[in-house]
């Protein structure tokens, strides 16, 4: 028994050794094939070739496009997808190529879209205005051509348009109504045009899928090159914004007022341009959590503030060095936005209605009476001013120059009609608007007048002082004459 057991044990060991050797051979073969493939597959050679091909195709007009030229795109799409699957390639080195190739892919998608419109407009001319999206347009064409649509299969067509083409119910309704009038169902396409349409649909869908794959790849690595933008709006939206602009530096140059419209769908004739929130530019940024988690009433204000902060974050990321993931400013800006959004969404505080204050019993202002009339006389125009404001009919007004060199009209203040209107009558003059003098000032003025009179009398100008009495003049003469001189004078002439 022991010999049989030993024999079976030796067989098991031998079989195990053979299996292990076969596994090792298979692994070595796989490694050699992978090494051969990596040696042949160089992404930094394929990417410039793909960029050059996409650039040349983008310059061709849709009328002159041929399928032999578009057929070269498919192998390049396969190579680009292989590059995206390799994780060992440095993302920083690949990013400049992706920034250059993303706009070219978009232009090629637009080229294929226009090519499809030029081919299919003979059969359904209104379709391009009803379905503006290139991907939905190609899917609708494939549904209409492959499903053999007839009037009895309207339910089946509705199902395919909703699930495969991802159309809304409003779009489907408008499309079915337009098909009854402008869709030429009885005029099928020829074989050549049909094959061109199918191949163009395939290329357009592959380009669209490649664009989405590149966007997802950049979203997975976006925190390396744009940490602040990624922190504010999330990796997916940050990747869409940067991919649309073509790089972080290009995105930082876009003004904040234009960021909201990036990724916005074209307006359709049957759709409303604004929703309840009042926002017209519903692009990539409008779908971020910083806007959607708050009430609809503050969406418009939050979108404007978020665009400003995203623009600042992009400039910060563009100025940082590679590998620097400093998000201090993004944390600060996000906290500010959250605080402002909470303040905007709060209900207004109910202010208590205050009662009117109790009226104070004060004496009312007087508008008449003797004192009030005397008070108003202070501000009344003088009689000369009133005459200056009047003009004599048929005569030229006399004017004088003031200190500033401007002419001032004298009116009737310097005419012979003063006498006629009573200019010199003292009874009509009012002293109400004259300056009021204090007792001290009156005393000082009277003393000054008295001194002036005495000085004039001493000079012999008594004739010009009619108010002085003769007694005062004789008294003043006696004070200022010398009696000795008088006696000498009489004695000398005696």
Swiss-Prot record:
Site entry (Interaction with U4 snRNA), positions: 257
Keyword RNA-binding: yes
Domain Nop residue range list: 225-346
Domain of life: Eukaryota
Region (Disordered): 344-370
Any coiled-coil regions, as ranges: 88-122, 191-225
GO cellular component: a single term: nucleus
PROSITE patterns tied to this protein: NOP
Single Gene Ontology MF annotation: RNA binding
Subcellular location as annotated: Nucleus
UniProt xrefs under SMART domains: NOSIC
Record carries keyword Cell division: no
UniProt keyword annotations, A-Z: Coiled coil, mRNA processing, mRNA splicing, Nucleus, Ribonucleoprotein, RNA-binding, Spliceosome
Main location: nucleus
BP GO annotations: mRNA splicing, via spliceosome; spliceosomal snRNP assembly; spliceosomal tri-snRNP complex assembly
Disulphide-bridged cysteine pairs: none
Domain notes: Interacts with the snRNP via the Nop domain. The coiled coil domain is formed by two non-contiguous helices.
Function: Promotes the association of the U4/U6.U5 tri-snRNP particle with pre-spliceosomes to form the mature spliceosomal complex.
Miscellaneous: Present with 1260 molecules/cell in log phase SD medium.
Quaternary organization: Component of the U4/U6-U5 tri-snRNP complex composed of the U4, U6 and U5 snRNAs and at least PRP3, PRP4, PRP6, PRP8, PRP18, PRP31, PRP38, SNU13, SNU23, SNU66, SNU114, SPP381, SMB1, SMD1, SMD2, SMD3, SMX2, SMX3, LSM2, LSM3, LSM4, LSM5, LSM6, LSM7, LSM8, BRR2 and DIB1.
Family, similarity comment: Belongs to the PRP31 family.
Protein name, entry field: Pre-mRNA-processing factor 31
Gene: PRP31
